[in-house]
């Protein structure tokens, strides 16, 4: 449970607005050159608030409002809000990856300020590992402070937390041996592999923990376990991640579809089996 909260905190950091607590990872500044690559027209319809694209993107997108769905691949929540998994979710980290979170009012007071709780565990403090959410090009976006390297005490606490999480996982596996589970889809299996890699990462180093997440491709699965037509890499170095179109069943790229930093309009390159049968029936 502790490791899950630690990893959940890392993803929450990508999805939320900044907090005054010490930041372990900061996005690079949005230079004029990077901002010049953004689309010229403002998002439509008009937004109540503009925020940076997911990850470390620099282009403006409409912020998600309270009650709207959110996740790793969606736009961020508006100021004063945070993307939370649904209460009681058994897999909160996976829920955020799948975009099944909900924008809600910040609940930082539940944890207390960092000044009042200087001895809190890393998984508790990870709730404040935030990446700037505002659309600005100055130091407020990137910050000038270098990433803080965790102390030996914190590294030991992380190791203990990871071992406890592994023990809990082994215990759950033993209890579920007699239970029949539905077959996992290819997308879900790939997602499980990525989450397993994340759980085994050596997070504390000089690059900052979120750098590791950007190096991975997290499969974008829908609620039924299939691949979403559009798959995207996370934004990095102020640029939007590349997006491409895939077959929902196999996850392989659709022939003729582009790989671009934007919307590849995947509906133009894929015909569902139902649509294909309907077209055949209408043909003379």
From Swiss-Prot:
Residues 23-106 form the IGFBP N-terminal domain. Keywords: Developmental protein, Disulfide bond, Growth factor binding, Growth regulation, Secreted, Signal. Residues 136-145 have a biased composition (Low complexity). GO terms for molecular function: insulin-like growth factor I binding; insulin-like growth factor II binding. GO terms for cellular component: extracellular region. InterPro entries: Growth_fac_rcpt_cys_sf, IGFBP-2, IGFBP-like, IGFBP_1-6_chordata, Insulin_GF-bd_Cys-rich_CS, Thyroglobulin_1, Thyroglobulin_1_sf. Residues 117-127, 152-180 have a biased composition (Basic and acidic residues). The keyword Signal applies. Residues 1-21 form the signal peptide. Disulfide bonds join 27-56, 30-58, 38-59, 47-62, 70-83, 77-103, 187-221, 232-243, 245-266. Its main location: secreted. CDD domains: TY. Residues 184-266 form the Thyroglobulin type-1 domain. Gene3D superfamilies: 4.10.40.20, Thyroglobulin type-1. It is found in: Secreted. Transmembrane segments: none annotated. A motif (Cell attachment site) lies at residues 261-263. SMART domains: IB (SM00121), TY (SM00211). It comes from the Eukaryota. Residues 108-184 are annotated as: Disordered. IGF-binding proteins prolong the half-life of the IGFs and have been shown to either inhibit or stimulate the growth promoting effects of the IGFs on cell culture. They alter the interaction of IGFs with their cell surface receptors. Interacts with igf1 and igf2. This is Insulin-like growth factor-binding protein 2. The gene is igfbp2.
């Amino acid at each position: 449970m502790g490791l899950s909260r630690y990893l959940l905190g890392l993803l929450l950091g990508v999805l939320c607005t900044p907090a005054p607590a010490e930041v372990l990872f900061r996005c690079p500044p949005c230079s004029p050159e990077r901002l010049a690559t953004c689309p010229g027209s403002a998002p439509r319809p008009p937004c109540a608030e503009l925020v940076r694209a997911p990850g470390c993107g620099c282009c403006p997108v409409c912020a998600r409002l309270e009650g709207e769905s959110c996740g790793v691949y969606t736009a961020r929540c508006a100021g004063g809000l945070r993307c939370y998994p649904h209460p009681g979710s058994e897999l909160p980290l996976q829920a955020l990856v799948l975009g099944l979170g909900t924008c809600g009012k910040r609940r930082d007071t539940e944890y207390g300020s960092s000044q009042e709780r200087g001895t809190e565990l890393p998984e508790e403090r990870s709730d404040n590992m935030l990446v700037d959410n505002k659309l600005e090009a100055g130091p407020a976006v990137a910050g000038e402070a270098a990433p803080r390297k965790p102390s030996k005490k914190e590294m030991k606490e992380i190791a203990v937390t990871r071992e406890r999480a592994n023990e809990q996982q082994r215990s759950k596996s033993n209890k579920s041996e007699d239970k029949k589970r539905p077959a996992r889809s290819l997308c879900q299996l790939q997602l499980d592999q990525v989450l397993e890699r994340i759980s085994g990462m050596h997070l504390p180093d000089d690059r900052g923990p979120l750098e590791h997440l950007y190096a991975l491709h997290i499969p974008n699965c829908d609620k039924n376990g299939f691949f979403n037509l559009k798959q995207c890499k996370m934004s990095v170095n102020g640029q939007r991640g590349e997006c491409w179109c895939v077959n929902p069943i196999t996850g392989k790229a659709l022939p003729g579809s582009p790989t671009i930093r934007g919307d590849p309009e995947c509906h133009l390159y894929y015909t569902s089996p139902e649509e294909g049968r309907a077209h055949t029936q209408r043909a003379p």
